[in-house]
């Protein structure tokens, strides 16, 4: 049982004096789990973290998904060291970016052409620009609760109706921009049809997380993605897959390979950087040729395709391409899911677990979760208590009821067994 967070608390107090909110991303604060000082980590190795107080944790945050090969994986670390020794930024073309682009195309046949950027936010933002350039239209359709980065156009929430023009979800986003976004519920074909009947002639693209990762792990209903493609193309719109979370997480070829559905454009990030900042987007040749210098849709970046990120990404994919990687993640994920459910039954705790291979979400509810409304109507207060109990047990989770637990190639059966025991102790405390 971890009881000493003295240095983390002192560091957070100091951070509040210098960094807005004491964190560099709001998801790192503990606001969503009842408040308190977030734990400051000092180093990571494999599936483990050590904080500034010297406490050790089994990590299921995985930096919100990118660290699928574990912390400081030797193959990835070696590649980063080599890149650092050779110079991390040139501002010129390199052989590394060509090699990495070819690897991505091999993994995802829908990528005729690829362009590297520096984040998932940038990748999504640019696919939208490209879709608008290609179609000559301005509106974007997205699904409620799906997060696509913090650019103005996608930082919107649904209005009062089941399908509606967006309303700003952040101060600083003009209403006029939010009104270019139509939001509909995930997994609801009828509402999608209604929205396209009304606005389809104005829609440049439908933006989709093919497997949702931002209100927990939620899979599409059978046939849903196929109908999204069919309806979008009938309306003259493109389909953009946001695979920032899903690419290389569930299968080497991403969700589009796993589910057998092909988008027009794909946005990538997280895992493909091996832990370094990265994004990429790609798609059909005739669409991607809208991008400068070939076409009128401008996109550029000083850091884009830098040798350090390219090297880390290549090394990460080389690890993931090894035989048995995804089978191991699935096996450990199934073991963890089974153990959590057994502990919940033992201690009479109401939960639902959504799992796909090596990622899962624990919702404090008995309801089936298949859309954002369902995820919202879960017990956040109970999750907050569970989160802090697990932290004291040495289990590092994301501080939000909406986030996933991510397994890495470095987790072991022993890690899972300890985690299940810790879940049991946390549930026992919650049941009192």
Swiss-Prot record:
GO terms for biological process: protoporphyrinogen IX biosynthetic process. One of its GO terms (molecular function) is glutamate-1-semialdehyde 2,1-aminomutase activity. One of its GO terms (cellular component) is cytoplasm. It catalyses: (S)-4-amino-5-oxopentanoate = 5-aminolevulinate. Keywords: Cytoplasm, Isomerase, Porphyrin biosynthesis, Pyridoxal phosphate. Pathway: Porphyrin-containing compound metabolism; protoporphyrin-IX biosynthesis; 5-aminolevulinate from L-glutamyl-tRNA(Glu): step 2/2. It is found in: Cytoplasm. CDD domains: OAT_like (cd00610). It comes from the Bacteria. Its cofactor is pyridoxal 5'-phosphate. The modification N6-(pyridoxal phosphate)lysine is found at residue 270. Its EC number is 5.4.3.8. InterPro entries: 4pyrrol_synth_GluAld_NH2Trfase (IPR004639), Aminotrans_3 (IPR005814), Aminotrans_3_PPA_site (IPR049704), PyrdxlP-dep_Trfase (IPR015424), PyrdxlP-dep_Trfase_major (IPR015421), PyrdxlP-dep_Trfase_small (IPR015422). Its main location: cytoplasm. Homodimer. Belongs to the class-III pyridoxal-phosphate-dependent aminotransferase family. HemL subfamily. PANTHER family: GLUTAMATE-1-SEMIALDEHYDE 2,1-AMINOMUTASE, GLUTAMATE-1-SEMIALDEHYDE 2,1-AMINOMUTASE 2. This is Glutamate-1-semialdehyde 2,1-aminomutase 1. It comes from Bacillus cytotoxicus (strain DSM 22905 / CIP 110041 / 391-98 / NVH 391-98).
